[in-house]
Amino acid sequence: MKEILDLSVETNMVTAPRTVSPLDLASAVMDLMAKENIGSIVVVENNRPVGIVTGRDMLLRVLKLEKNIELTVVRDVMSEPLVTIEAGRTIADALEMMQRNNIRRLVVTRKGALVGLITERGLLEIAHSHYMMRGRLKVVDDHRIHRIRVAYVSTYPPRECGIATYTKHLVDATIAYCTRAVMSPVGVAMNDRGGYYDYETRVKSQIDVDDIQSYEKAAQYINASDVDVVNLQHEYGIFGGEWGEYVIELLKRIEKPVVTTLHTVLEVPVPDARRVLEGVLEYSDFVVVMAKAGMGILERVYGCGGDKIKHIPHGCPNVHHIETAMTKRSFGLQDRVVLSTFGLLSSGKGIEYVIDALPQIVKEFPEILYLIIGETHPEIRKREGETYRQFLLNLVESLGLKKNVRFVNRFLPENELISYLQATDIYVIPYPNREQISSGTLSYALSTGKAIVTTPFLHAEEVISNGAALKCEFKDPNSISECVNTLLNDKQIHQRLSRRAYEYSRTMIWPNVAMSYVNLFYHALGL
């Protein structure tokens, strides 16, 4: 419990909550609550919060007393004195203040200025994750938690790979937030062809992608070690053999429980892809999917039992939801409307459809700048060089868009990537294929509170259905331009989508994801 209660209230607060002034009319408050489906609005005077108006206030102090809603001002309705909490205080402090004052919401301030709102519902979400984990933790006779050691089989930094980045965040989060449950982790790193890396010290064993004997040696190392459970990060392309079939030789030989995270689940697999994934399923005690749609595919297409499949969302960083203007200045973009897409570049990303959509967007908004962030995928670069990037550059030039498109051709450190996202007005995901079951870029865009325009690939379908993203059609520049122009022309829709994206991401932040994984590791061990 301590790991959660010691987090700052900023972890789960709603940033940029809706505000009104004390002299605004109660009718305006009611309109806003109805339009945006919100239960409270902060009252601000001279940039300082002075009260809060809730749905209960409106019912008891206006409607019940039969006041004229067109003549009643907010000052006569709001709850005061206002109870606030400083952003640096802990969730434990927030819970105590809510209980002491018998309230469900706390206005969060920094040096007296409004920075957010923390709600009972938000605290319940993080508490739910904690208690799920607590129920699985085994307490030994001396009343300490039975700590386990996990081996992670995956690519690792400094290798430039999305799976490597994901694994680093997962490992770091389990160390940071589950210290009473896990011991120092063990890394088993997947090397690409000809790739040798200066790994951090937690990497104790390495597998050369095309050397079948190195898979066997890695299994021997794991079996002889004090590792309790193995987490395998599975993506076809990081393992050797046809469709990465060498991973089965590794799994066959591991004598410890295995929890496998599936980054790709094909709904219409070719025979070799089916064979390999069926082997992974056979030799795994549990498998994790990041989108709930993956659970149905595994049961329906691969015949995997439902009890074996667990849903844990793709993790995301816990960052502040800030106005884009604050970050745009640091990039010299204060006069631009910024669209962006990030990730390792390859033809499967569909960037060309956004470029094709730009003329219709630029016609209405000539200040548009589309940022294409990320270098070409290293494996693609080995096989094809910069063919795809050059294709995109040629397309930009042929459409006369050189002033409206900028390539950031680097693998960015996380803090710089987040800054670019915070400077983004609309984040676009134009994936051309439906079968994408997980997307780190989608998770990051949600975590920074972006208004998102995305094609309905499997992971995105769930986000769209929850009102946290706007759907555009596959391979359809006209659909993309229509969605972007709609958001830019209607600030209310844009702001509502942005807030919903941020709120949706709160259950996906790394502390929650780490606890879910540790909970599953204990379950795999029968604890």
Model-inferred region functions:
Residues 446-447, 451-454:
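Short hydrophobic beta-strand element within catalytic cores of glycosyltransferases
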Residues 466, 470-477, 486-491:
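Conserved acidic donor-binding segment of nucleotide-sugar-dependent glycosyltransferases
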Residues 333-349, 355-358, 370-373:
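Conserved donor-binding/catalytic core segment of Leloir-type glycosyltransferases
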Residues 282-322, 333-334:
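Donor nucleotide-sugar binding/catalytic pocket of nucleotide-sugar-dependent glycosyltransferases
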Residues 19-37, 44-45, 84-102, 108-110, ...:
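The conserved cystathionine-beta-synthase
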